[in-house]
Amino acid sequence: MRSMNLVDLWAQQACLVFNQTLSYKSFNGFMKIPLKNSKINPKLNKKRPFSPLTVSAIATTKEDERIEAAQTEEPFNFKIYVTEKAISVNKALDEAIIVKEPHVIHEAMRYSLLAGGKRVRPMLCLAACELVGGNQENAMAAACAVEMIHTMSLIHDDLPCMDNDDLRRGKPTNHKIYGEDVAVLAGDSLLAFAFEHIVNSTAGVTPSRIVGAVAELAKSIGTEGLVAGQVADIKCTGNASVSLETLEFIHVHKTAALLESSVVLGAILGGGTNVEVEKLRRFARCIGLLFQVVDDILDVTKSSEELGKTAGKDLVVDKTTYPKLLGLEKAKEFAAELNREAKQQLEGFDSRKAAPLIALADYIAYRDN
C-alpha cells in the first residue's frame, strides 16, 4: 500500500494549512495569596474605595497576565492529535474483531477494516465526545462501530453489481481477494457486529444514552440515510438532467449521514445537552457534504496513484457530480462556503476543546486524497 502512513500524510497536509498549530485564547482566574509573617496596622486594614488609577493598574496587570498565559500555553498540534487517535482507534478495531471460525469471513472483515484509511469518522466521534465533556473511553466503541459500517459501505460499493471497483485504499478490493459471495457476507457481518459492539463495549455511559446512540446510527444508514442516498445515486446515474437539489439529497444521505451520525454519537455518549447535540449535528452535516464535494473535485483532478482508488470513475459512468453541475471553480467555492458554515456551528464551545473539530473540518476541505 502506497500510504507512507496515511496518518502521517494526513497530518502533514493539515499542518501545511495550519502552519502546524492552532492557537487559542485562555482565561486565568484570580488567586488570593496570603501574606505570611506580616504585621498589619489595624488602621491601615480598613476597607477603602479604590481610586480610578488603582483600578486601572489592577486591570492592566490582570490583562497582561492573561496575555502572557495565552502566549505560553502549548498550542494544539494536529499531527500529534491525529497520530494518537489513529493508534487508539486502530488498536481498538484490531481487538474488536479477531480471527475465529469460520476463518474466511473474519479474515475478509479484517482485510478491509484494517486496510488503512483516514479514520475521519472515528476521530470525529471521539472529538465530539470530548468537546461536550466526555472522555475517549465513552465513545471508543461507537467510533469503531461507525468505521465498521463505513467499511461495509465500501465493500458493497465496490462490488460488480454496484460501482465495480478493483482498487480501494491502494489495495485490491475485498471481492477481488475473497470473491463476491464472501465480500457481501463480510459487509453484512460488519454491519451487524457494529451494533453489537456499541451495546456490549460502551463504557461509563447510561443505558438511555446508549439506546439513543444505537437509534441514531441505525437511522443514518437505513432508508432515511445511507441507503436512501445510494438508491437515488443509482437511479440518477446516466441521467443528464439531475438537478443540484437532487444531487444534494444524494450526498446528504449517502455520504453526510454517516459523518453526521459519527459526530452526534460522540456528543450523545459524551453527555452533551440537546442544544449541544443539535449544534454539532449542523456542523457535521456541513462537513459531510463538504467531504463529498471535495471527493468529486479530487476525482477529476488527481490520479489513481494519488487517490489510492480508481480516479475518473464518475466521468466514465456519467455520474452527476458537483464539478459537472457547477464547474470546477464553483465547486471549490461551494466547498469553502460549507467549511465556513461548519465552523460557525462551533462558536460558543470551549475553543481548546473545539480545536480538533476545526482542524478536522479544514483537513476535509484541503485533503489531497
Curated annotation (Swiss-Prot):
Residue sites binding Mg(2+) 1 per the record: D157, D163
Residues annotated to bind isopentenyl diphosphate: K118, R121, H150, R169
Keywords: Carotenoid biosynthesis, Chloroplast, Isoprene biosynthesis, Magnesium, Metal-binding, Plastid, Transferase, Transit peptide
Record pathway: Isoprenoid biosynthesis; farnesyl diphosphate biosynthesis; farnesyl diphosphate from geranyl diphosphate and isopentenyl diphosphate: step 1/1; Isoprenoid biosynthesis; geranyl diphosphate biosynthesis; geranyl diphosphate from dimethylallyl diphosphate and isopentenyl diphosphate: step 1/1; Isoprenoid biosynthesis; geranylgeranyl diphosphate biosynthesis; geranylgeranyl diphosphate from farnesyl diphosphate and isopentenyl diphosphate: step 1/1
Entry EC no(s): 2.5.1.-, 2.5.1.1, 2.5.1.29, 2.5.1.10
A molecular function (GO) term: (2E,6E)-farnesyl diphosphate synthase activity
Cofactor note: Binds 2 Mg(2+) ions per subunit.
Name assigned to this protein: Geranylgeranyl pyrophosphate synthase, chloroplastic
Organism: Capsicum annuum
